[in-house]
Protein backbone atom coordinates (compact mmCIF):
# COMPACT_ATOMS: atom_id res chain seq x y z
CA UNK A 1 0.00 0.00 0.00
CA UNK A 2 1.37 3.42 -0.97
CA UNK A 3 2.07 5.97 1.73
CA UNK A 4 0.21 9.28 1.66
CA UNK A 5 2.26 12.31 0.74
CA UNK A 6 3.06 14.26 3.89
CA UNK A 7 2.11 17.94 3.84
CA UNK A 8 4.21 20.58 5.58
CA UNK A 9 1.21 22.52 6.86
CA UNK A 10 -1.88 20.55 7.88
CA UNK A 11 -4.10 23.54 7.00
CA UNK A 12 -2.74 23.68 3.45
CA UNK A 13 -4.95 22.31 0.68
CA UNK A 14 -3.02 23.14 -2.50
CA UNK A 15 -0.02 25.22 -3.57
CA UNK A 16 0.78 26.88 -6.88
CA UNK A 17 4.55 26.44 -7.01
CA UNK A 18 4.71 27.48 -10.65
CA UNK A 19 3.48 30.98 -9.77
CA UNK A 20 6.54 31.66 -7.61
CA UNK A 21 8.80 30.45 -10.44
CA UNK A 22 7.10 32.49 -13.19
CA UNK A 23 6.43 35.73 -11.28
CA UNK A 24 8.00 38.14 -8.81
CA UNK A 25 5.47 38.25 -5.96
CA UNK A 26 5.30 41.85 -4.70
CA UNK A 27 2.48 41.52 -2.16
CA UNK A 28 0.14 38.81 -0.92
CA UNK A 29 -3.53 38.97 0.04
CA UNK A 30 -5.96 36.51 1.57
CA UNK A 31 -9.51 36.12 0.28
CA UNK A 32 -12.45 33.87 0.93
CA UNK A 33 -14.05 31.69 -1.75
CA UNK A 34 -17.75 31.32 -2.55
CA UNK A 35 -18.07 27.52 -2.85
CA UNK A 36 -20.82 24.95 -3.14
CA UNK A 37 -21.14 22.01 -0.74
CA UNK A 38 -19.70 19.38 -3.08
CA UNK A 39 -16.65 21.59 -3.67
CA UNK A 40 -15.88 21.80 0.04
CA UNK A 41 -16.11 18.00 0.32
CA UNK A 42 -13.72 17.62 -2.61
CA UNK A 43 -11.30 20.12 -1.06
CA UNK A 44 -11.27 18.11 2.17
CA UNK A 45 -10.16 15.11 0.08
CA UNK A 46 -7.49 17.23 -1.66
CA UNK A 47 -9.00 16.92 -5.15
CA UNK A 48 -8.03 20.36 -6.45
CA UNK A 49 -5.53 21.81 -8.93
CA UNK A 50 -4.76 25.52 -9.14
CA UNK A 51 -1.66 25.40 -11.36
CA UNK A 52 -3.49 26.56 -14.49
CA UNK A 53 -5.79 29.01 -12.73
CA UNK A 54 -5.76 32.79 -12.77
CA UNK A 55 -7.67 35.68 -11.23
CA UNK A 56 -9.72 38.19 -13.19
CA UNK A 57 -10.79 41.56 -11.79
CA UNK A 58 -14.00 42.63 -13.50
CA UNK A 59 -16.92 44.92 -12.52
CA UNK A 60 -15.35 45.58 -9.10
CA UNK A 61 -15.34 41.86 -8.34
CA UNK A 62 -12.56 39.26 -8.26
CA UNK A 63 -13.09 35.86 -9.91
CA UNK A 64 -11.05 32.66 -9.86
CA UNK A 65 -10.87 31.02 -13.30
CA UNK A 66 -9.50 27.62 -14.24
CA UNK A 67 -9.27 26.04 -10.79
CA UNK A 68 -10.11 22.37 -11.19
CA UNK A 69 -12.08 20.93 -8.27
CA UNK A 70 -12.88 17.32 -9.13
CA UNK A 71 -16.24 16.13 -7.79
CA UNK A 72 -16.21 13.08 -5.56
CA UNK A 73 -17.60 9.83 -6.93
CA UNK A 74 -20.12 9.78 -4.08
CA UNK A 75 -21.39 13.28 -4.91
CA UNK A 76 -25.02 13.77 -5.83
CA UNK A 77 -25.88 12.74 -9.39
CA UNK A 78 -29.07 14.77 -9.77
CA UNK A 79 -27.21 18.09 -9.98
CA UNK A 80 -24.66 19.18 -12.54
CA UNK A 81 -21.16 19.63 -11.16
CA UNK A 82 -18.88 21.83 -13.27
CA UNK A 83 -15.30 21.25 -12.06
CA UNK A 84 -14.01 24.35 -13.88
CA UNK A 85 -16.75 26.82 -12.96
CA UNK A 86 -15.72 30.34 -12.05
CA UNK A 87 -15.70 31.11 -8.35
CA UNK A 88 -16.11 34.49 -6.72
CA UNK A 89 -13.42 35.74 -4.36
CA UNK A 90 -14.67 37.41 -1.19
CA UNK A 91 -12.55 40.50 -0.53
CA UNK A 92 -13.06 44.00 0.84
CA UNK A 93 -13.99 46.62 -1.75
CA UNK A 94 -10.91 48.74 -1.02
CA UNK A 95 -8.62 45.73 -1.58
CA UNK A 96 -10.23 45.00 -4.95
CA UNK A 97 -10.03 48.69 -5.96
CA UNK A 98 -6.35 48.81 -5.02
CA UNK A 99 -5.59 45.63 -6.98
CA UNK A 100 -7.51 46.93 -10.01
CA UNK A 101 -5.54 50.18 -9.95
CA UNK A 102 -2.18 48.43 -9.78
CA UNK A 103 -3.09 45.91 -12.49
CA UNK A 104 -4.26 48.68 -14.85
CA UNK A 105 -1.38 51.12 -14.28
CA UNK A 106 1.85 49.30 -13.53
CA UNK A 107 1.55 46.05 -15.46
CA UNK A 108 0.99 43.82 -12.48
CA UNK A 109 -1.14 40.70 -12.54
CA UNK A 110 -2.91 38.77 -9.80
CA UNK A 111 -2.12 35.06 -9.39
CA UNK A 112 -3.38 32.41 -6.96
CA UNK A 113 -0.63 31.11 -4.66
CA UNK A 114 -2.40 28.52 -2.54
CA UNK A 115 -5.53 27.28 -0.82
CA UNK A 116 -5.72 26.71 2.94
CA UNK A 117 -8.15 26.29 5.82
CA UNK A 118 -8.66 29.12 8.29
CA UNK A 119 -11.16 28.62 11.14
CA UNK A 120 -13.06 26.03 9.13
CA UNK A 121 -13.33 28.21 6.02
CA UNK A 122 -11.43 27.86 2.74
CA UNK A 123 -9.15 30.80 2.03
CA UNK A 124 -7.07 31.53 -1.04
CA UNK A 125 -3.72 33.31 -0.94
CA UNK A 126 -3.32 35.57 -3.95
CA UNK A 127 -0.27 37.50 -4.99
CA UNK A 128 0.24 40.80 -6.75
CA UNK A 129 2.85 39.72 -9.26
CA UNK A 130 5.05 40.93 -12.08
CA UNK A 131 6.16 38.47 -14.75
CA UNK A 132 9.72 37.18 -14.88
CA UNK A 133 11.80 37.19 -18.03
CA UNK A 134 13.73 34.08 -19.07
CA UNK A 135 17.02 35.38 -17.64
CA UNK A 136 15.30 36.08 -14.31
CA UNK A 137 14.06 32.49 -14.18
CA UNK A 138 17.58 31.23 -14.91
CA UNK A 139 19.03 33.40 -12.15
CA UNK A 140 16.43 32.10 -9.70
CA UNK A 141 17.23 28.50 -10.66
CA UNK A 142 20.97 29.15 -10.35
CA UNK A 143 20.51 30.67 -6.89
CA UNK A 144 18.33 27.74 -5.79
CA UNK A 145 20.93 25.23 -7.02
CA UNK A 146 23.74 27.09 -5.25
CA UNK A 147 21.81 27.12 -1.95
CA UNK A 148 21.18 23.38 -2.29
CA UNK A 149 24.89 22.72 -2.97
CA UNK A 150 25.85 24.92 -0.02
CA UNK A 151 23.62 22.86 2.27
CA UNK A 152 25.21 19.63 1.00
CA UNK A 153 28.72 20.97 1.58
CA UNK A 154 27.84 22.12 5.09
CA UNK A 155 26.24 18.76 5.88
CA UNK A 156 29.26 16.69 4.88
CA UNK A 157 32.03 18.99 6.10
CA UNK A 158 30.58 20.11 9.39
UniProtKB/Swiss-Prot annotation:
Primary subcellular site in the record, as a coarse category: cytoplasm
Species of origin: Hydrogenovibrio crunogenus (strain DSM 25203 / XCL-2) (Thiomicrospira crunogena)
Alphabetical list of CDD domains matching this protein: SmpB
Keyword Secreted: no
Protein name: SsrA-binding protein
Functional description taken from the UniProt entry: Required for rescue of stalled ribosomes mediated by trans-translation. Binds to transfer-messenger RNA (tmRNA), required for stable association of tmRNA with ribosomes. tmRNA and SmpB together mimic tRNA shape, replacing the anticodon stem-loop with SmpB. tmRNA is encoded by the ssrA gene; the 2 termini fold to resemble tRNA(Ala) and it encodes a 'tag peptide', a short internal open reading frame. During trans-translation Ala-aminoacylated tmRNA acts like a tRNA, entering the A-site of stalled ribosomes, displacing the stalled mRNA.
This protein's record includes keyword Metal-binding: no
Keywords per UniProt: Cytoplasm, RNA-binding
GO molecular function, one term: RNA binding
Compartments (UniProt record): Cytoplasm
Gene3D superfamilies from the UniProt entry: 2.40.280.10
Any one of the GO BP annotations: trans-translation
Similarity section: Belongs to the SmpB family.
Lineage: Bacteria, Pseudomonadati, Pseudomonadota, Gammaproteobacteria, Thiotrichales
GO annotation, cellular component aspect: cytosol
Gene responsible for this protein: smpB
InterPro entries hit by this protein: SmpB (IPR023620), SsrA-bd_prot (IPR000037), SsrA-bd_prot_CS (IPR020081)
Amino acid sequence: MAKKKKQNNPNSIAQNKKARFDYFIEETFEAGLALEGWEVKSLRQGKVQINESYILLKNNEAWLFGALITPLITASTHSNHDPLRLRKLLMHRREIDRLMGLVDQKGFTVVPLGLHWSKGKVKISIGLAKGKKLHDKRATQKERDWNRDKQRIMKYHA
